[in-house]
Structures are given as C-alpha cells and as structure tokens.
Design a protein with these regions (language model features):
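A domain-start/cap signature at the N-terminus of enzymes
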Residues: 26-61, 65, 111-173
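C-terminal catalytic histidine-bearing segment of alpha/beta-hydrolase fold enzymes
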Residues: 130, 310-317, 321-357
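Serine-hydrolase catalytic machinery in alpha/beta-hydrolase-like enzymes
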Residues: 174-243
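Primarily recognizes the serine-hydrolase "nucleophile elbow" in alpha/beta-hydrolase
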Residues: 247-293
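Short beta-strand/loop motif that positions the catalytic acidic residue
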Residues: 299-301
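Acidic catalytic loop of the alpha/beta-hydrolase fold
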Residues: 303-309
Length: 357
C-alpha cells in the first residue's frame, strides 16, 4: 500500500487545484496540508487495501474527496477488491461530476465479481443511472452472483450452550434467540458465554440479507415475517442437533435486531415466551398493536442515544405495557451495551425466563 502509485492517485485527486495555481506560495501549501494529511497518514500506515477501504469508510461522511482518494488507491493496489471500485463509482455518481467515469468504475467492480446486488438495487447514489444499459447489466450480474454467495450464509446459525455444570445434564433447555444489529452477524464466541450461562442455549442467527461482505447482514422488510421465518428455521435446525424446550423460546436483540425481536413477540406470542430489547432501532415503523399477554419483557437503552432510538424504546415500553410484566433500564452510554452487561444481562435473562432476577 505504501507504493508510489497510491501516493500518486491521492496527490492527483487532492492537489489538482494546485496544478491550476502554480504560483501558490509556501503559505498556501501549508494551508493545503491539513486536507491532505489524513490521506497521507492512511497511505503510510495502512497494512493493505482492505484497511484502506475501512479508513475511507470512516472518512466518507466528513470528507468525500479524501475518501475517494483512498478508495482509488485501494482499487489500484488490490485488483481483487470489490468494494473499492464500487465506492469510487458511488461517490462519483453522488457528486454528479462524471457519469461515464462512474459507470466505468461500476463496470470494473462487475469485472471483479461484484455480488451485492440488493445493495446496488437500492443505492440512491445511482438513481440517475438506473436507466443505462451498463447499470442494468451490472445489476443483473450482481443479483445472480448474490444468490450464490448468500446460499448457506443467510439465516445460518451459531450455537452456544451453557458451561458444564450450569444446568442439569440431559435437560431440554430453553433457548434465547439472538438477533444482531445492522451490518454484523449472528456468530457467537466466548465473549457471549455469560449469556448462555444464564441457563439457556444461545442461538445466533444471521440476518435475512447480506449487505456488502459475507459477514455483514441485515433484517429486511417490509414487515417482520421474513425474520419470523428465519428464526423458526433456525430453531428447527437447532432442534435437530439437541433437545430444546420449544415452549420456552425467548428473544434478545440489539438495534435493528431488537426492533425485530419486539415485533415478533407482539405478532407471534404463541411462539415466543418473552423478549429482551436492547437499544431498539431501525427504519421500519414499530408495531402499534400487540397480541402478547403474560410475557416478561425488558427494554434497555442508553440515555445518550439518538432521538429515534429513544422514541422506539418508549414505543416498546408502551406496546407491552398492558397485560405483560415490563422492566425498564437506562444507562449512561449511547447506542451500545451498558458497561456492566456481562453481569447485568445474565441477571436480566434469568428474570425473563421466570427467575427472581
């Protein structure tokens, strides 16, 4: 990455104005350096093209031109990088500066095997190009590749059992279904063990659609039935492996997964025994009616979350407030777990599953 080519790309893009102003003074050059230094630092310190893309992602909201320079460098550095040329095309299209150039980089992404068709289909950056033959051809190819990439990944499960000695051997255990937030996945690791040690099988499920990498998923609408079907399929797969108590299936979610967990409990109370909703979020409307009665529900959010998330937390408190037992907790953080989650979450799960908590 620390190549002359990468520096040349960045310099050509960011210092183009200097070529037109050859008489700039040293003071002018000093004034330009703050705009250039984040790109130079990234090019010097990034280990590979993938890290350049991550750094560009972090810059995109604050400085599109700096991000564009890094995406270009990553695209040139690694001929197998898919997202880099895609993001170059998207940023050029967003700026409306050169449709031909934007389509050229979109084609380059296609030639490298672009597969995230659903993301391309809804990407507003390309709204003015959807009529073009190039865009339509790239989209068709990406949608076809997506079906291959998604097979076996969308809805895949991850299982974490309680530690030895936590529950009686041979018991058909309750299940806590974990619904992840936007852009991550249902994979469980050792850091999640405290949740399983509350006395249930922890079942993580990948979302119903991949986004732009094989470990990045979301729960798609309209509505929540697709998520319900994915959860039921995950439970069926789990039941084929081990004995579980299907009458004691609980939901736990974060952010977008939390909204879907709350909606599933409201709409399918015969299938779910309770829910723990952490920092609900998402773009769909929260259900306004609930069939759930006699359930234990926890709603947890940070006081520093955005207004939409705060409203959604209150919406769920009201939604389950009649005929159910609702506990509420706020913490000092933002859209994240509270700092004490490793102890407070297992305690909350035990209460949700019928304990004293």
């Amino acid at each position: 990455v620390k190549s002359l080519l990468a520096f040349t790309v960045a310099a050509a893009l960011l210092l183009g104005a200097s070529v037109a102003h050859a008489a700039d003074t040293p003071d002018d050059e000093e004034a330009d350096f703050p705009a250039l230094s984040p790109v130079v630092n990234a090019l010097i310190n990034a280990d590979d093209a993938q890290e350049l893309v991550k750094r560009a992602d972090a810059m995109e909201d604050s400085n599109e031109l700096q991000a564009l320079a890094l995406y270009l460098a990553a695209s040139r550095e690694d001929p197998h990088q898919l997202r880099a040329p895609y993001q170059v095309a998207a940023l050029l299209a967003r700026r409306g500066s050169d449709e031909t150039l934007a389509l050229r980089y979109l084609q380059e992404a296609d030639e490298r095997g672009l597969w995230f068709g659903p993301m391309l289909a809804e990407d507003a950056d390309f709204a003015e190009m959807r009529h073009t033959a190039v865009y339509q051809n790239v989209l068709a190819n990406a949608q076809q590749r997506y079906r291959t990439e998604a097979a076996g990944r969308v809805g895949a499960i991850s299982v974490l059992n309680p530690s030895p000695g936590v529950v009686k051997a041979g018991t058909c255990l309750p299940v806590v279904v974990w619904l992840h937030g936007y852009g991550i996945n249902g994979y469980l690791d050792d850091s999640d063990q405290p949740l399983a040690d509350a006395g249930a099988v922890l079942l993580g499920i990948n979302g119903t659609e991949m986004i732009d990498s094989v470990d990045s998923f979301r729960w798609i609408g309209p509505g929540f039935e697709g998520t319900h079907q994915a959860v039921q399929a995950g439970l069926k797969a789990l039941a084929a492996r081990q004995c579980i108590d299907r009458k004691r299936v609980y939901l736990m979610g974060f952010s977008q997964g939390s909204q879907h967990a709350g909606a599933l409990l409201a709409q399918h109370p015969q299938d779910y025994a309770g829910a723990m909703l952490v920092s609900p979020g998402g773009n769909q409307a929260t259900p306004t009616q609930s069939k759930a009665r006699g359930k234990r529900v926890l709603v947890i959010n940070g006081t520093g979350e955005g207004p939409r998330n705060l409203r959604m937390s209150e919406d769920f408190r009201r939604l389950f407030g009649t005929g159910n037992e609702v506990r509420s907790r706020t913490h000092d953080g933002g859209h994240s777990y509270p700092e004490d989650w490793r102890t407070s979450f297992p305690q909350a799960l035990r209460w949700m599953m019928g304990g004293d908590g």
